C-alpha cells in the first residue's frame, strides 16, 4: 500500500497478482492547464469532460474514412450506409467502455494488458497494436501526399516522402499549445464537412433511398463485402481504444463512487456527441458520392472519375459549392485531416509502447519510427501503381485494422466485464451481452471474408496444383493461428485484480490527473515512494 503526499488517497488491491503496474504519481500541485472537475453535482461539470471524445473522433473522419466513403457511394450508391450506422453505434458502445476502463482503474488499456498477460502474449499484443498504429498511419501518409499533389502538383511518391517532415513540423509546434493546434486542425477538417453538407443540398439525394440504405442491410455485387469490412475497419479502430482509455486520465475527478459514475456518464454523452458529428460527416460523404456518381446526366469525364474514384479525384464532388476552388479547399481539408489524425495516432503509439513495454520515446522519435514504417509500403505502391494504387492501399490498410480489432477489443470487453478489475462499476449484464454480440459479429464477418477470399484466390489462381496445395496449407495454418489467438483471449480467465484508487475516509477525495497524460509527453514517472 502506498499513499500520496497528502495521505488522503490510497491504492487498495483486492488481489496481489504476479505482475504490477508501472507506478504513476498523483500530482499534488496542479498547474494552470489542468482541467479540474468540481465536487458539486451540476450539469456544468460536463464542460470539464469535453475533449477526449472529440480527439478520438478525429480518427473517424480521417483520409481512410474519406476514401472508403467515396468508393462506397460511387460503386454502391447508398447501399452501404447501414454499415456506417451500425459501426457508429458499435463505436459509441466500445469507446465508452474504453473511457470507463481508464476512469475506474486509473490505468489505460495497454497497461492493463501488461499487468494481466504473461510476457509472450503481452509482447504479441504489443506487436499487433503497433501494426495497427502503422496501418492507421498509411491512409494519413497517402492522404497528405494527395493533398500536396492537389495543392502544389507534387508527384504522389514525392509527397509520400514529404509527409514525415510535415508531421514533425506540426509536432514541433506543440510548445505553443497542443490544444490550440488540434482545435485549429479540427476547424479545418470541419470546413470540408460543411462543404459536404452544402453539397448534399445541391446533389439532392433521394431521402427515401438514403433511409433505405441506412436501415436495410444489404451486400450486393462483387466487392461489397470487402468494402463493408474496410468501412468497419475505418470506423472502429483498435488504436482508438488505447487512446481513449488514456486520454480520460487527464481529468481531475472526484474518486467517490458517485463521482466516478458521473465521469463515466459525461464521457458517454461527450463521445456520443463527437461520434454523431463524425457519423453525419461520413453519411454526407457517401450520399454526395452516391448521388453525383449515379446521376443520369453525368459527364464522360466525371463518369470516368467515379469508376476509379479516390481521394486524388474527389474534389470534383465539391464543384457546385466552391467552383474552381474545389480542388484547393478539398486539398487543405485533406491535409488537415491527415495531420490531425497523425498527431492523435502518435499519442496512441506512445501509450501503446509505454503501456505494453513500459518504454517511452520523445514524440518526434515515436512519430519518425511509425511514419518510416508507413512510408515504405506507401512509397512502393505509389511508385508502381501511382495514385490509383495508393488509393487501393488505403482500403487494404482499413481491412487490416478490421482484422486486428479483436486483439484490442477482446481484452477491453474482458476487463470491463470483470468485477475484480472494475469493482462496482463493472458492466451490467445487458451491456456485457451487447458488447460481446457486437464483438462476435465483427469477428465473424472478418473470419468469413478471410476464409472465403482465400478459397476464391486459390480456386482462381493459375498456379500449379502443388503450389496451390502448399499455399493452401500455409494459408489455412495462418487462419487457424489467428482463430486460436482470438480463442485464447476470449476463454482465458482474468487473473490479476486492478489496484483501484479509492478513499477510506471521505466521499469527496479527489485524485489529480496522471502527469504523463496531462502533458502528453510521457515523461519518466516517479514511483509512489518518491511522492511520499
Curated annotation (Swiss-Prot):
Residues 1-25 are annotated as: Disordered. Keywords: Cell membrane, Ion transport, Iron, Iron transport, Membrane, Transmembrane, Transmembrane helix, Transport. Induction: By Mn and Fe deficiency in roots. One of its GO terms (molecular function) is iron ion transmembrane transporter activity. It is found in: Cell membrane. The chain crosses the membrane at residues 46-66, 79-99, 123-143, 151-171, 181-201, 229-249, 266-286, 329-349, 372-392, 393-413, 431-451, 466-486. Residues 13-24 have a biased composition (Low complexity). GO terms for biological process: cadmium ion transmembrane transport; iron ion transmembrane transport; manganese ion homeostasis; manganese ion transmembrane transport. It is a multi-pass membrane protein. Residues 1-12 have a biased composition (Polar residues). Its main location: membrane. One of its GO terms (cellular component) is plasma membrane. Disruption phenotype: No visible phenotype under normal growth condition, but under Mn limitation, very slow growth and unable to take up Mn. High affinity manganese (Mn) transporter involved in Mn acquisition from the soil. Required for Mn uptake into the root in conditions of low Mn availability. Can transport iron (Fe), cadmium (Cd) and cobalt (Co). Belongs to the NRAMP (TC 2.A.55) family. This is Metal transporter Nramp1. The lineage of its organism: Eukaryota, Viridiplantae, Streptophyta, Embryophyta, Tracheophyta.
